[in-house]
């Protein structure tokens, strides 16, 4: 299933929403209608939260079905709230690195993870352990270090910024164990994560996404209509 969505009129829904196959972390300001659409499309429990008192959950959080990586600026009460509502569904871990926009710097499915070269190599083993992945790889894509913003990957397929090379696509296919396709969202936006939230069950795209863009994403992520 794939559906259109905006957040307060903004088509860049991936900035605000983090999702895996178990939960979706959304701003507390979403309407009940939008929360229901997220729940039904992705087949997950919707949990309202902020990170560091900001509603940009998709930018601040990285993870997969095994673990969530949270920035060092998460507030203690926010962490307590997440632990209470997530329980033992997913491991929660604060990543003690200078960078805080972890969702823009790390992409993961349940098989592999790609990490920005901006993140200290010394922390890679911890990331691999929290996410429980077989493969972790650190590099830029198309000479851009914010690799998490360029990728949306599930356990079924992946989409990536059109500026990447064929060699880089082959690397992504190997790291994540799925096939990648270049794609855009929201009428030509290359940084696909900004306008796309997806898991193995479904996807939500920003409401400025064109029909051809939607079809390409749907095929790449191997989703039903």
UniProtKB/Swiss-Prot annotation:
Database matches in Gene3D superfamilies: L-arginine/glycine Amidinotransferase, Chain A
Molecular-function GO term, any one: translation initiation factor activity
Entry's family note: Belongs to the eIF-6 family.
Protein name: Translation initiation factor 6
Residue ranges of the TM segments: none
Keywords: Initiation factor, Protein biosynthesis
UniProt record, GO biological process: cytosolic ribosome assembly
């Amino acid at each position: 299933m794939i559906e259109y969505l905006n957040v307060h009129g903004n088509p860049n829904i991936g900035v605000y929403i983090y999702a895996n196959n178990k939960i979706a972390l959304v701003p507390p300001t979403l309407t009940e209608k939008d929360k229901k659409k997220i729940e039904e499309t992705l087949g997950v429990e919707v949990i309202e939260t902020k990170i560091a008192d900001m509603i940009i959950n998709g930018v601040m959080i990285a993870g997969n079905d095994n673990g969530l990586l949270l920035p060092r600026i998460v507030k203690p009460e926010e962490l307590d709230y997440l632990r209470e509502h997530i329980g033992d569904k997913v491991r929660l871990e604060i990543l003690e690195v200078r960078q805080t926009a972890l969702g823009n710097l790390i992409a993961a499915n349940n098989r592999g993870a790609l990490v920005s070269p901006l993140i200290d190599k010394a922390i890679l083993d911890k990331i691999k352990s929290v996410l429980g992945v077989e493969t972790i790889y650190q590099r830029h894509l198309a000479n851009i270090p914010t690799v998490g913003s360029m990728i949306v990957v599930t356990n079924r397929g992946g989409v990536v910024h059109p500026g990447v090379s064929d060699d880089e696509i082959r690397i992504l296919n190997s790291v994540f164990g799925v096939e990648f396709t270049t794609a855009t969202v929201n009428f030509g936006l290359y940084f696909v994560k900004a306008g796309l939230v997806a898991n193995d069950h479904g996807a939500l795209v920003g409401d400025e996404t064109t029909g051809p863009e939607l079809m390409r994403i749907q095929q790449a992520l191997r989703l039903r209509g």
